[in-house]
């Protein structure tokens, strides 16, 4: 990423339409065309940030104890009034993302078809918000991560494939799998990221999704989970785990990329339990996941595997307006420069999301 000096940005209807050198702009007599000149007086414009791992269904407010998200979502989606209220909240959260400097989000698990609906409302100018690449509901398994809340619980390969047809009808932009458990799913020390989804299901969904033209993102928080995901066709690893040579080789063999998410595990790993209300097991496993994500990011960067950033907003302690923290954590814990962190959250994110021709630089 290099700073470009002496540039002119043309904006029409609140959209950047062109960026050109000041010398060229001077030849075009833009004022005569109705443009108003705003001199930034030496300031810089940063490309819009790209948050590659978002759940629009949550505000990040920590709970004193775990709640039954499956029951809560079932209640919310059970009638028109509560659904309308929930959609209004989701719209507000997307607006928060935009006003915090995030101009593109990639949603990887949400309520029903809310995310694609909002994507289209924003594109049509009906709602303010960032560009959205939407997966809608993810695919999990009974007892799996987020099952019944922002992901369906597929009891068989057939059910998982049926959901792909629903997702296609909703015109999603990508598919999301929940392959392993998460920090709060593990009931014993040392086993966060337990494999929940059978490799056969992962492969079946990836094969069909690819045939439909979709990329597949997968929640994985253990070395075994990462390897199962990559071996069976997953395109992006969300979170990651401690890397070894086999894992790195699989990333390269399958041209996959890593979405680093330091924000969700950090509170459980580093905050005092009196603040997080976490159990000793949750704190221990939070640290395992946090260290694994850091290690995976470092290994990926060292081996030229593409890395993007997401903050897993919706998880406890992560708000819809603090994606900037993820960049700081990336710098502090992975050891990258500020410049590289900005590059990762702009240009690299745009490239991996397939929108590098319209944003990111």
Say what each PLM segment does.
Residues 1-46:
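Histidine-rich, glycine-flanked metal-binding segment
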Residues 117, 159-178, 183-258, 274-275, ...:
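Histidine/acidic residue-rich metal-binding segments in metalloenzymes
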Residues 1-7, 12, 20-22, 76-77, ...:
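Active-site microenvironment of metallo-dependent hydrolases
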